[in-house]
């Protein structure tokens, strides 16, 4: 163990000199500068969470993958001591909304049964069948951008393309009325903002729960041709989900299905605009779009970390994580690890970046990753072909970055051509 590791509390559990987590990102694209030092000095170190409790930060690519695949870690957010970047009481943990107990917040065998019910809806083959509709949606949104530009003012790419594309896709897939987008998009913004007071977070979660409670009840009585209806019908036979879990799962799928991809589209477009040689390579060979999507997922890593709690003592990188201690697997650090990616701080759309951990790793790896990849592929191969003169309409330093959110991105992206 190095002196630096000791100074930041690798072995201490309650030291007052622990660094605080979360740490500020470096806009527009880079993770906190502290991560690079951690990877060198000690890829398994301790930090203080907003709750006032310490947790283990895992920063190396190898170590992040190892911890996320370890059966001795739990994703059960209701456990006391589970790390969180918002203050939460044990009573609030017990009253967590349904999506906290569905899929992302469960362990085997409960998690296994839930995932098995859903995985067939997101296979490569199933997602490939959606491609024509995704292409149609992307082209329609670009048509709208081109029409709006007749007014000779900048167009907000977030509002006109990045958010509508995945929102409409996931709404049609789930069977959620797209007309309700202002309701769920607005409440998603509240939930992912770190500074949202606990009372407001609970109130918004309850509004979403009530919305999906009504939707699931309606689909139970009158099923349609959509994922939620198929899930309800299948559940009649298997009884894997309670009604409350179905409500929570629907909430999770909708929120995760539009917010994450929307931010990669917007921030990825900005990254390509700020790296003209990479944009030119993509324009010259649109078949680079899938590789570009993987590299942008790695380079940007908009979801900073995955949170777990140890259920048994774990030895890793010379440290002992004891049962009951919180763990923060820093995907944003792992994806900039030079031992896994050459020149990790450079954007290179021709590198092989498929082994990134932007979608997580292990049994909780993102269920909708094939859909996200398809959406990113279609957007990036279409946008620059149809609007070759696309450019940023303001200085990059004037953009409103989501420094205050669980999911990184930009609130607005004014573009012109």
PLM regions: where:
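Cytochrome P450
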Residues: 1-417
């Amino acid at each position: 163990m190095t002196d630096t590791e000791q100074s930041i509390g690798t072995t201490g559990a309650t030291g007052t000199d622990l660094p605080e987590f979360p740490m500020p990102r470096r806009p527009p694209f880079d993770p906190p500068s502290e991560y690079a030092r951690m990877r060198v000095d000690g890829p398994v170190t301790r930090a203080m969470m907003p709750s006032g409790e310490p947790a283990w930060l895992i920063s190396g690519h190898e170590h992040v993958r190892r911890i996320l695949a370890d059966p001795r870690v739990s994703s059960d957010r209701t456990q006391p001591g589970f790390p969180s970047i918002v203050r939460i009481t044990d009573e609030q943990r017990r009253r967590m909304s349904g999506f906290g107990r569905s899929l992302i917040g469960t362990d085997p065998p409960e998690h296994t049964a839930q995932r098995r019910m859903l995985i067939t809806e997101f296979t490569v083959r199933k997602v490939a069948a959606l491609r024509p509709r995704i292409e149609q949606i992307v082209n329609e949104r670009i048509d709208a951008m081109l029409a709006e530009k007749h007014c000779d003012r900048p167009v907000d790419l977030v509002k006109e393309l990045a958010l509508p594309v995945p929102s409409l896709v996931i709404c049609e897939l789930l069977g959620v009325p797209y007309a309700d987008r202002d309701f769920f998009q607005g409440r998603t913004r509240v939930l992912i903002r770190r500074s949202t007071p606990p009372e407001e977070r609970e109130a918004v979660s309850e509004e979403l729960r009530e919305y999906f409670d009504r939707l699931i009840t309606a689909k139970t009585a009158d099923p349609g041709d959509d994922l939620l209806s198929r899930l309800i019908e299948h559940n009649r036979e298997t009884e894997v989900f309670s009604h409350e879990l179905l409500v929570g799962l629907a909430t999770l799928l909708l929120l995760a299905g539009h917010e994450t991809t929307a931010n990669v589209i917007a921030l990825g477009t900005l990254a390509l605009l700020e790296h003209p040689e990479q944009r030119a390579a993509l324009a010259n060979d649109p078949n680079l779009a899938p590789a570009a999507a993987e590299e942008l997922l790695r380079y940007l890593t908009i979801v900073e970390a995955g949170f777990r709690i140890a259920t048994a003592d774990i030895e890793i990188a010379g440290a002992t994580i004891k049962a009951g201690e919180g763990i923060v697997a820093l995907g944003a650090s792992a994806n900039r690890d030079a031992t896994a990616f050459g020149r990790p701080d450079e954007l290179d759309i021709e590198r092989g970046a498929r082994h990134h951990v932007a979608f997580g790793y292990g049994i909780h790896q993102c269920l909708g990753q094939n859909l996200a990849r398809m959406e990113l592929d279609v957007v990036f191969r279409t946008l620059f072909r149809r609007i070759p003169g696309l450019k940023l309409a303001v200085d990059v330093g004037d953009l409103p970055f989501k420094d205050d959110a669980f999911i990184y991105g930009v609130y607005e992206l004014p573009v012109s051509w």
